[in-house]
């Protein structure tokens, strides 16, 4: 297994950007892979491109527009507004069915062609937004499936799986990239960079985590 190279699933948001710089500290060669699935806010891809260009990281954008046709939701359709809070039953309407399944599967194909075994993704079960494909059991299951499907030894690493948003901010701080993550990323479901709209679930989670992180720094 090649332990010197890694591919990061990279959206340009807080979590994947933190993982990207975490990977840069650990591996000699890091490649970022983003997906164009006709998401509502193309600024997400612009942030990903800008970060990779600015910090000299090899970056690839793969076309996955089919996902928009298969799974209409509030992140891909202008006529569907984002839920402001989690529903009592089911998943939020910002959940894109099959997104992480497809992202990781396509990245695995890409990784094998490059002779890379390690795939890094920023999913988290501790502070997740009710998305089933952010759970540890899913990642472990998919890792086994991909290994069997391609007769190849992949290792899917999830640095954020068991930490909350405050701890994710602390990781960025410890890596020396807090300002990059705070100012240059896009997490907002309404497509607003940095601190975002402040109203969508992603912004509320990000803001709450930062507030808790600041409290930690002051202690």
From Swiss-Prot:
GO biological process: queuosine biosynthetic process
Entry EC no(s): 6.3.4.20
Binding positions for Zn(2+) per the UniProt entry: 188, 197, 200, 203
Transmembrane stretches, start-end: none
Pathway: Purine metabolism; 7-cyano-7-deazaguanine biosynthesis
Cofactor entry: Zn(2+)
Entries under InterPro entries matching the protein: QueC (IPR018317), Rossmann-like_a/b/a_fold (IPR014729)
Top-level class of the enzyme under EC nomenclature: ligase
Keyword field contains Membrane: no
Record note on cofactor: Binds 1 zinc ion per subunit.
Keywords linked to the UniProt accession: ATP-binding, Ligase, Metal-binding, Nucleotide-binding, Queuosine biosynthesis, Zinc
Binding residue positions for ATP: 10-20
Pfam families attached to this UniProt entry: QueC
GO function terms (MF aspect): ATP binding; ligase activity, forming carbon-nitrogen bonds; zinc ion binding
Keyword Ligase: yes
Catalytic activity: 7-carboxy-7-deazaguanine + NH4(+) + ATP = 7-cyano-7-deazaguanine + ADP + phosphate + H2O + H(+)
Family the entry assigns: Belongs to the QueC family.
UniProt subunit comment: Homodimer.
Role of this protein: Catalyzes the ATP-dependent conversion of 7-carboxy-7-deazaguanine (CDG) to 7-cyano-7-deazaguanine (preQ(0)).
Identification of the protein by name: 7-cyano-7-deazaguanine synthase
Species per Swiss-Prot/TrEMBL record: Clostridium botulinum (strain Kyoto / Type A2)
């Amino acid at each position: 297994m090649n332990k010197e190279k890694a591919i990061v699933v990279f959206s340009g948001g807080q979590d994947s950007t933190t993982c990207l710089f975490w990977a840069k500290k650990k591996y000699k060669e890091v490649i970022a892979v983003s997906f164009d699935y006709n998401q509502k806010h193309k600024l997400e891809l612009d942030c990903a491109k800008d970060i990779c260009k600015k910090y000299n990281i090899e970056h690839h954008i793969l076309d996955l527009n089919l996902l928009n046709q298969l799974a209409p939701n509030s992140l891909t359709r202008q006529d569907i507004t984002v839920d402001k809070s989690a529903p009592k039953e089911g998943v939020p309407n910002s959940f894109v069915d099959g997104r992480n399944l497809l992202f990781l599967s396509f990245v695995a194909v890409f990784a094998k062609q490059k002779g890379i075994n390690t795939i890094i993704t920023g999913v988290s079960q501790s502070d997740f937004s009710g998305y089933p494909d952010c759970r540890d059991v899913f990642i472990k299951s998919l890792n086994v499936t991909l290994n069997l499907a391609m007769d190849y030894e992949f290792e899917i690493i999830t640095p954020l799986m068991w930490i909350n948003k405050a701890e994710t901010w602390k990781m960025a701080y410890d890596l020396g990239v807090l300002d990059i993550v705070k100012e240059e990323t896009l997490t907002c479901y309404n497509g607003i960079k940095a601190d975002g709209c402040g109203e969508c679930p992603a912004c509320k989670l990000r803001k709450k985590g930062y507030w808790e992180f600041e409290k930690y720094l002051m202690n």
